[in-house]
């Protein structure tokens, strides 16, 4: 029984974080998109599942899979436009974990800031008035500017360290 890395992505952020994590996994560890997940997921002790945050939780494709995971160890990693150390980031992992059939199977979670699709920014600015939580403001513009460079090399290094520490914890 081994480990598999699954990821759902929209802009490529989560895919690139998954690939960084895969580079420190034991040789032969599968790393595939959620839509290509093998039917025999129960054959794996540990599932690393990556998703992009949508409305404060895992995106729909990943959420559907999370609801079915009964593996012994589940590890989440997520990308979002907000800062990785924000309350929103932490709460996104918590909300995704609430979807698990067995909440005790969640080992840990990692969050990385990622660039935001410009179409999403445009849509948000049209939907929400300036100054509102999701509307245009100097703070929101600064957040989007900061997100443009992520994930970056430091994020990938952090993702690799996270993956190594989780594997060590599970083996120890």
Regions found by a protein language model. Name each.
Residues 1-2, 106:
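A structure-centric signal for secondary-structure junctions around beta-strands
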Residues 2-24:
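N-terminal beta1-alpha1 ligand-phosphate binding loop
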Residues 3-5, 40, 158:
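A general marker of short, structured functional hotspots
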Residues 24-32, 44-49, 54-172:
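FMN-binding flavodoxin-like domain, especially the glycine-rich phosphate-binding loop
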Residues 37-43:
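Short amphipathic alpha-helix with an adjacent loop that forms part of the alpha/beta core around
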């Amino acid at each position: 029984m081994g480990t598999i890395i699954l990821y759902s992505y929209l802009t490529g952020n989560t895919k690139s974080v998954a690939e960084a994590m895969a580079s420190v996994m034991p040789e032969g560890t599968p790393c595939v998109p959620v839509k290509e997940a093998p039917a025999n997921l129960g054959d794996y002790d540990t599932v690393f599942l990556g998703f992009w945050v949508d409305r404060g939780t895992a995106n729909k494709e990943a959420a559907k899979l999370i609801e079915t995971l009964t593996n012994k160890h589940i590890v989440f990693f997520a990308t979002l436009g907000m800062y990785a150390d924000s309350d929103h980031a932490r709460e996104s992992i918590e909300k995704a974990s609430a979807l698990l059939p067995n909440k005790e199977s969640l080992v840990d979670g990692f969050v990385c800031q990622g660039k935001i699709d410009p179409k999403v920014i445009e849509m948000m600015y049209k939907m929400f008035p300036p100054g509102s939580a999701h509307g245009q403001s100097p703070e929101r513009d600064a957040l989007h500017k900061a997100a443009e460079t992520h994930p970056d090399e430091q994020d990938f290094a952090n993702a690799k360290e996270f993956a190594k520490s989780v594997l060590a914890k599970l083996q120890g």
